[in-house]
Amino acid sequence: MIDLSRRAMLAGLTGTAVLATLSGPALALTEDQAVSYVQSMAADIEKTINSGRSDAQMYKAFEQLLNQYADMDTIARFALGPAARSASSGELSAYTAAFRTYLSKKYGARFREFIGGDIQVQGARKDKRAVIVSARAKPRGQSAVAVDFHVSDRNGKVFNVILEGVNLLTTERTEITSLLDQQGGSISNLTAELKRRS
């Protein structure tokens, strides 16, 4: 069983792939296309990890990877839960910006622990609305763990990651809605708290 600190570190590697919008026409994504996409993402993550950048530069680079490989607007709305439906456009915009930075710092902080590690794609299979790409993530000096990337058949982006049975998408929603409750249901207060934690 993977320990919590190791799970958090591995989550940092796969945090670019949590959720992308499921609206719009289907792309009829092939397994080969999904594999190629995940391989490209993994290569960019490894390149960033091994770049020798400072922590601040790593966080910024990770935020760019999130923007490139995931629909961050949709991720933020999903994580916020039902409260997103009643939020004003201004509240949602401010929250989304804060959430994006918060997420990049949260997972980016674990990057250095993976220097010298890698992600190896094992194969892919079709699912209802996605192609599931199976991989093995191996931190330096530790055993490899199973990671499943769910790539949307509608927009070609990764919309969820299952890391040793842990659903990263629902994990983020649980954490953000809990923070929202702690802030009395105020989205503006939640936004301020996310900024404080970033």
Descriptions of predicted regions:
Residues 163-198:
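Low-complexity, intrinsically disordered terminal/linker segments enriched in charged
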Residues 1-16:
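N-terminal secretory signal peptides and thylakoid transit peptides that target proteins
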Residues 47, 53-57, 86-90, 113-116, ...:
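Surface-exposed, polar/charged faces of alpha-helical domains
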Residues 17-23:
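Hydrophobic h-region of N-terminal signal peptides that target proteins for export
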